[in-house]
Amino acid sequence: MSAQSALSGLGAKLLSGEVEVVDCTGVLGPNTPILQLPPDFAKNTPKVEIHKISEYDSDGPFFAWNWMVLGEHSGTHFDAPHHWITGKDYSDGFTDTLDVQRLIAPVNVIDCSKESAADPDFLLTADLIKAWEAEHGEIGAGEWVVMRTDWDKRAGDEAAFLNADETGPHSPGPTPDAIEYLLSKKIVGWGSQCIGTDAGQAGGMEPPFPAHNLLHRDNCFGLASLANLDKLPAKGAILIAAPLKIERGTGSPIRALALVPKA
């Protein structure tokens, strides 16, 4: 089948509903949970603000529009390699210089929802990924891998979403060996349903924050605060995760969409 025929076929199946578009994005607004870092460690991203310019009134009689205060890494978002010190030297590591061909790819969905419900500090290891592959098939080069935890169900309550106490945040994520294994498979990027791509306690790992550290070291991408991964199959969907083309952007809120064969 030619590429033209394949695209025509996909278009027809989208129009017929045989291929469903699943929104993997959380709502972006003033109540969106935002990562909170210790003030003695680093500055924090401000909360999202939406301010009205006009709404069919004296400030604009025929139109409605707003202006916003918005951090690059707010809500469902994309981490570019330049986001982390290990990726700082890539000329194509910004949101305006990256290769857009890489942004749309098959997605592997590793379901860790039961484990994460039982233990908020659950860690996905390389051995668990290999066991998943034995059941569902190999993870291919250039593909996305995302960890389903159903953490998005907490997004309406920032305290529950961040899940922090005096020992720090508690949320599921990958181990260093999990990320190294995925990088050996030549993935394009890794995604999480939590506030960031790492586990809550990842600061104590070696290296610290391995998803950030290792992914961006290898010029790969991260996705965070994904939603509705429970609507995706383990394999067979296509993920579209395109950041805004921000000049020298280290990341961007995204509208993450998945193309899924309708059951």
Swiss-Prot record:
Its EC number is 3.5.2.20. It catalyses: isatin + H2O = isatinate + H(+). Mn(2+) binds at H73, H77, D79. The active site is at H83 (proton donor/acceptor). The lineage of its organism: Bacteria, Pseudomonadati, Pseudomonadota, Alphaproteobacteria, Hyphomicrobiales. This is Isatin hydrolase. It comes from the Bacteria. GO terms for molecular function: arylformamidase activity; hydrolase activity, acting on carbon-nitrogen (but not peptide) bonds, in cyclic amides; manganese ion binding. Belongs to the Cyclase 1 superfamily.
